Amino acid sequence: MWKLLPAAGPAGGEPYRLLTGVEYVVGRKNCAILIENDQSISRNHAVLTANFSVTNLSQTDEIPVLTLKDNSKYGTFVNEEKMQNGFSRTLKSGDGITFGVFGSKFRIEYEPLVACSSCLDVSGKTALNQAILQLGGFTVNNWTEECTHLVMVSVKVTIKTICALICGRPIVKPEYFTEFLKAVESKKQPPQIESFYPPLDEPSIGSKNVDLSGRQERKQIFKGKTFIFLNAKQHKKLSSAVVFGGGEARLITEENEEEHNFFLAPGTCVVDTGITNSQTLIPDCQKKWIQSIMDMLQRQGLRPIPEAEIGLAVIFMTTKNYCDPQGHPSTGLKTTTPGPSLSQGVSVDEKLMPSAPVNTTTYVADTESEQADTWDLSERPKEIKVSKMEQKFRMLSQDAPTVKESCKTSSNNNSMVSNTLAKMRIPNYQLSPTKLPSINKSKDRASQQQQTNSIRNYFQPSTKKRERDEENQEMSSCKSARIETSCSLLEQTQPATPSLWKNKEQHLSENEPVDTNSDNNLFTDTDLKSIVKNSASKSHAAEKLRSNKKREMDDVAIEDEVLEQLFKDTKPELEIDVKVQKQEEDVNVRKRPRMDIETNDTFSDEAVPESSKISQENEIGKKRELKEDSLWSAKEISNNDKLQDDSEMLPKKLLLTEFRSLVIKNSTSRNPSGINDDYGQLKNFKKFKKVTYPGAGKLPHIIGGSDLIAHHARKNTELEEWLRQEMEVQNQHAKEESLADDLFRYNPYLKRRR
């Protein structure tokens, strides 16, 4: 801002502040700069104008250009040098100007005005820029040593606030410059800056009495201290505040790493990077290096300095409670603050050890990631021995819902067979963290837990279908648990199980460690396919029979649903093509499809027990019954087909009935002889025709359109004039006749009053 200060002579009084874009006339009457007691001053002696010569108003090294134009009679002198009349000259700060010859001397000075705004909205910045521009100043976004004011609506602990306090610059509201501009335009005293201090809005400080005025103590607040920054972003943000406060700021990285004694030197403050904060993006290698430095400081009884302590040390003008590595951390601090603000949150977080990451998702082998009810806070081994898996599977089978004692042994054998089958096909297990029911709980609670676990594990939403190898593939514990549970539930739904299945189970349970490459395997793939076919057909038949009866208990219904889903899941995994054959039984009509049961089982020449022979005979009897039923159903189907073929034939001779209206018709409207009644052997032929109605052949004659002519009521002026004249003539004759009658009327019989 340019100012014209009176130095000596008649021109005394207050200085004149010059706004940009305004012409100030110097004279003795009716002008902006008035010099009265000098006879050598002309009425329009000279003109002062201040304007910006650059378009970029953010360049603080450029100031408005002040020009002086002489229009006087006795002359104007700049630094005792007379100007030419009618010419302009550029003035500099400190130049002396003399108007006239009687010693009216002035001095030109430029007062810098560079305002830095913080936490202002768009409208506030626009109004501030306009006011500062008229006052001849600049507005900048980043704090520098040239800044003279910090403009804020409310004081928050930011980097700009810290730098302004250290440099001793005032913090004012935006309204200060608006009022200042009004005072200059009205030639009044500028407003008091103390009345425009913004309020303190910082939760970490609270209602403490804080002096935010320019204090000399803050200029050397960090003298003798060296702040070590381990992050380049922090160094760029906070180094200027440390340097303004008389301290030294250094950036230490892995490339230029110093010795450990450097970090332990007195007066050295290591700034906390806040690696525990999830918002800071730091590479893992750099995190390890930073963590090693933090551990070294802890071993020596030192602590890192949070970012917020730098700002609080400047505000309270002390480094005893703040920025002291050997002192205790003060309450109400936060280790790091995102962005330029140092006060966007207030919480105590001084622990340097990174907390264990909380994984809210657990990954099950060969499945998609899903939400789990528990947190996985520790690493678990990926491979576990087969013996441990067997124990867990047996525990699951023991905790299953209670069945009759006769079925318990078969369910245990089924679990053994499923385990050995998993061993033959899958050499390695991948254990995933799943929920196991407790053994010590009651049986009812265990059954509910297993049902809920089976539903959660088996009815999972999957977005992808993965291709699986036929031979070399890994099976998770969930899949093996599915096989075991399916076999156990099969035993529950099958009261009469073939003894061949039990014999094979017992034989395999005795010889569990079976090699996949051995040629003497008793449990081959063909056996597995045939057995699972029989079990699947029987299980589905049992389910259909249950659906016809009344609903039993809720637990049995849940088991049936789980069993049905298990068979759907085990089909692609074990590569077994189960052909489900449905059997429907009704009271009146029995219809069964043809069933071809072929068992190509190859067994060894070992002795078969009597129980197995009896079961084989029962199966042969069942096959015969099924064949007879299939023949009976085939006969019924053939008879039904014949009836359907006969019913498809339509009647040939029909009586055609027509409904006629009682209206006289033209002879040409309808020709009944033209109707063809002989349609041959056509099926579904339309043997009717729409009945005509009167007027169907042609449109009725409607009066309209061109038949109608619009009637326009035109006035005949000649006829009207003639009629008017005739009326006037008749009226005139009537008047004349009435006058004549009055003259010659004589009434001899007068009525006299008595």
From Swiss-Prot:
Keywords: Cell cycle, Chromosome, Disease variant, DNA damage, DNA repair, Host-virus interaction, Isopeptide bond, Meiosis, Nucleus, Phosphoprotein, Telomere, Ubl conjugation. CDD domains: BRCT_nibrin, FHA_NBN. The gene is NBN. PROSITE patterns: FHA_DOMAIN. Changing residue 683 to R: Does not affect ubiquitination by PELI1. Residues 326-346, 396-415, 430-478 are annotated as: Disordered. A motif (Nuclear localization signal) lies at residues 461-467. GO terms for cellular component: BRCA1-C complex; chromosomal region; chromosome, telomeric region; cytosol; Golgi apparatus; Mre11 complex; nuclear inclusion body; nucleolus. Residues 328-346, 430-440, 447-462 have a biased composition (Polar residues). GO terms for biological process: blastocyst growth; DNA damage checkpoint signaling; DNA damage response, signal transduction by p53 class mediator; DNA double-strand break processing; DNA strand resection involved in replication fork processing; double-strand break repair; double-strand break repair via alternative nonhomologous end joining; double-strand break repair via homologous recombination. One of its GO terms (molecular function) is damaged DNA binding. It is found in: Nucleus; Chromosome; Nucleus, PML body; Chromosome, Telomere. Changing residue 744 to A: Impaired interaction with ATM. Changing residue 583 to K: No loss of interaction with KPNA2. This is Nibrin. Residues 24-83 form the FHA domain. It comes from the Eukaryota. Residues 105-181, 224-315 form the BRCT domain. The modification N6-lactoyllysine is found at residue 388. The modification Phosphoserine is found at residues 278, 343, 347, 397, 432, 509, 518, 615, 673. Phosphorylated by ATM in response of ionizing radiation, and such phosphorylation is responsible intra-S phase checkpoint control and telomere maintenance. Phosphorylated at Ser-432 by CDK2 in S/G2 phases abolishes interaction with TERF2, enabling DCLRE1B/Apollo recruitment to telomeres. Phosphorylation at Ser-432 in response to dysfunctional telomeres promotes non-homologous end joining repair at telomeres, while dephosphorylation by PPP1CA promotes microhomology-mediated end-joining (MMEJ) repair. Induction: Up-regulated by ionizing radiation (IR). The FHA and BRCT domains specifically recognize and bind phosphorylated proteins. Component of the MRN complex composed of two heterodimers RAD50 and MRE11 associated with a single NBN. The MRN complexes dimerize on DNA to form joined MRN-MRN oligomers required for DNA double-strand break repair. As part of the MRN complex, interacts with MCM9; the interaction recruits the complex to DNA repair sites. Component of the BASC complex, at least composed of BRCA1, MSH2, MSH6, MLH1, ATM, BLM, RAD50, MRE11 and NBN. Interacts with histone H2AX; this requires phosphorylation of H2AX on 'Ser-139' and promotes NBN recruitment to DNA damage sites. Changing residue 388 to R: Abolished lactylation, leading to decreased recruitment of the MRN complex to DNA damage sites.
